[in-house]
Amino acid sequence: MSQQPVAFLTRRETFSACHRLHSPQLSDAENLEVFGKCNNFHGHGHNYTVEITVRGPIDRRTGMVLNITELKEAIETVIMKRLDHKNLDKDVEYFANTPSTTENLAVYIWDNIRLQLKKPELLYEVKIHETPKNIISYRGPYPLNGIYNPINKRIAHDSCTNISSDSD
């Protein structure tokens, strides 16, 4: 029996949003020191490009990892309806007490895209291009005792040992 082929499927979307990099856990002076001009009281905006990638076996019946329509609808719900042309700090509850860094934006998108997918374990990566030079990639929570494998498996640090577990 041959091994089932695995493929990556990526959908790209662009949205615009504004924010102010500011942490309620820091003083105003500390915020200015950490975030510099991005801590401007009036905020600033970005034209973000987001790439959502799923990874999984190619279904023998459909020839697909995931129907691209399902991914498109998840992106529409999570990104376009909730984030596009919004002030992240004021319009998105998640950022009320969480700094709206691109790293945290990637976590927000990851968590919410997973809720939209029939098979959330297929979500492999959220990549956000904040600018042409600043890009954040997020592949989900990192387990402390192993390297993260997005098909709900852990791979031991010892490259000679491969440990799989579906119960994580």
From Swiss-Prot:
GO terms for molecular function: 6-pyruvoyltetrahydropterin synthase activity; identical protein binding; metal ion binding. GO terms for cellular component: cytoplasm; mitochondrion. Zn(2+) binds at residues 19, 44, 46. The active site is at 38 (proton acceptor), 85 (charge relay system), 130 (charge relay system). The modification Phosphoserine is found at residues 159, 164-165, 167. It catalyses: 7,8-dihydroneopterin 3'-triphosphate = 6-pyruvoyl-5,6,7,8-tetrahydropterin + triphosphate + H(+). The keyword Zinc applies. Binds 1 zinc ion per subunit. Gene3D superfamilies: 6-pyruvoyl tetrahydropterin synthase/QueD. GO terms for biological process: pteridine biosynthetic process; tetrahydrobiopterin biosynthetic process. It holds the Pfam family PTPS. Its cofactor is Zn(2+). Its EC number is 4.2.3.12. The keyword Phosphoprotein applies. InterPro entries: 6-PTP_synth/QueD (IPR007115), 6-PTP_synth/QueD_sf (IPR038418), PTPS_Cys_AS (IPR022470), PTPS_His_AS (IPR022469). Keywords: Lyase, Metal-binding, Phosphoprotein, Tetrahydrobiopterin biosynthesis, Zinc. SUPFAM superfamilies: Tetrahydrobiopterin biosynthesis enzymes-like (SSF55620). The modification Phosphothreonine is found at residue 161. The active site is at the interface between 2 subunits. The proton acceptor Cys is on one subunit, and the charge relay system is on the other subunit. Homohexamer formed of two homotrimers in a head to head fashion. This is 6-pyruvoyl tetrahydrobiopterin synthase.
